[in-house]
Swiss-Prot record:
Protein name: Transcriptional activator protein
Subunit structure: Monomer. Homodimer. Homooligomer. Self-interaction correlates with nuclear localization and efficient activation of transcription. Monomers suppress local silencing by interacting with and inactivating host adenosine kinase 2 (ADK2) in the cytoplasm. Interacts with and inhibits host SNF1 kinase. Binds to ssDNA.
unnamed zinc-finger residues: 42-59
Segments of skewed composition (Low complexity): 1-20, 113-123
Species, as recorded: Pepper huasteco yellow vein virus (PHYVV)
Subcellular location: Host nucleus; Host cytoplasm
GO cellular component: host cell cytoplasm; host cell nucleus; viral capsid
Region Disordered: start-end pairs: 1-23, 85-123
Amino acid sequence: MTGSKKTPSTSPSKKLSSPPEVKLRHRFAKRQIRRRRIDLACGCSIYIHINCVNNGFTHRGTHHCSSSSEWRFYLGASKSPIFQNTASGDANVHTQPGISHSSQSKPQHEDSVGSPQSLLQLPSLDDVDDDFWADLLK
């Protein structure tokens, strides 16, 4: 016989671990930026998904636009933020009249059980005459 014999491999079995391409895909997916942090003037921080850009939200009576005018800038290490506003002042903040704007944390108001004042009070169906129901169901 002229063929040479193969020696068995000393490396661990490849069937026991994930294929390398799957590991690479998982590592890449973990590195992707999925949300963006915005630090508000009141001291709160929020996270906005990158697909939700240019959508607004209201926090403590102040409307914020999550557009490019609010962004987070890093120098050096990932934990050293410098917050930048490209517009001078608070062009991205819209205050709503009639809502207090104190910077202290307050509990939310409880929802009332009664009907809102903007809706009309409908009469009870028990107060409707029997003649009305007889005419209606003919």
